[in-house]
C-alpha cells in the first residue's frame, strides 16, 4: 500500500513522511488534485479518507481513480454539499459516510475493534505523535489550538493541576 498524505500546513509534512507517506500535499492547495494525479501517473488514487469535509471534498473526488472510493468520516470544515449522481458516474465513483457508533452494534464487535487498534499501537503500525496537555482552566486555548488545526498532535485537558 502506498499512501499520499494531506495536511493543513507545511509544518506537518515531515511527520507524514516519517509515518510512511510517499508524498504529502497541503489540502487547501488549489493544485492538490493535479499533484495527486501527477504522482499517480494520471490514474488517481483508489481510496480517499476525508475527515475535513466541505473544504476538501471536491479535490478528494477529483483525486480518485476510476471506480475509486471516497470515505468521508468527518466534516470539520462544515457539511458536504449534495452530490449529483452524474458526477459519480463520470468515473464510477462510490462514496460512504460512516458513523463510528454504528459499527459498535454489540459489545463483542466493540471489543474486537478496540483490541485490533490497541495491537496496532503496540506493534507501532499506528504511531502516536506528540501530546499537547492543557490545564482545564485553559480549555479555551485548547479549543483555539484544535480549531486552528495547528496542534499537530493529540490535545487533552488535564485535571491534575487544578
Which residue ranges define each predicted feature?
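Terminal helix/beta-alpha structural elements that buttress the NAD(P)+-binding lobe
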Residues: 1-159
Amino acid at each position: 500500500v502506498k499512501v499520499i498524505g494531506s495536511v493543513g500546513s507545511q509544518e506537518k509534512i515531515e511527520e507524514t513522511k516519517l509515518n510512511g507517506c510517499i508524498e504529502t500535499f497541503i489540502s487547501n492547495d488549489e493544485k492538490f488534485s493535479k499533484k495527486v494525479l501527477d504522482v499517480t501517473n494520471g490514474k488517481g488514487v483508489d481510496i480517499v479518507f476525508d475527515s475535513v469535509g466541505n473544504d476538501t471534498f471536491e479535490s478528494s473526488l477529483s483525486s480518485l481513480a476510476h471506480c475509486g472510493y471516497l470515505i468521508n468520516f468527518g466534516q470539520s470544515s462544515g457539511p458536504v454539499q449534495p452530490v449529483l449522481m452524474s458526477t459519480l458516474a463520470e468515473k464510477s465513483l462510490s462514496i460512504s459516510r460512516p458513523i463510528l457508533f454504528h459499527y459498535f452494534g454489540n459489545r463483542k464487535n466493540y471489543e474486537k475493534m478496540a483490541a485490533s487498534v490497541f495491537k496496532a499501537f503496540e506493534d507501532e503500525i499506528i504511531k502516536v505523535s506528540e501530546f499537547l496537555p492543557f490545564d482545564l482552566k485553559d480549555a479555551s486555548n485548547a479549543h483555539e489550538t484544535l480549531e486552528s488545526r495547528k496542534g499537530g498532535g493529540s490535545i487533552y485537558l488535564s485535571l491534575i493541576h487544578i
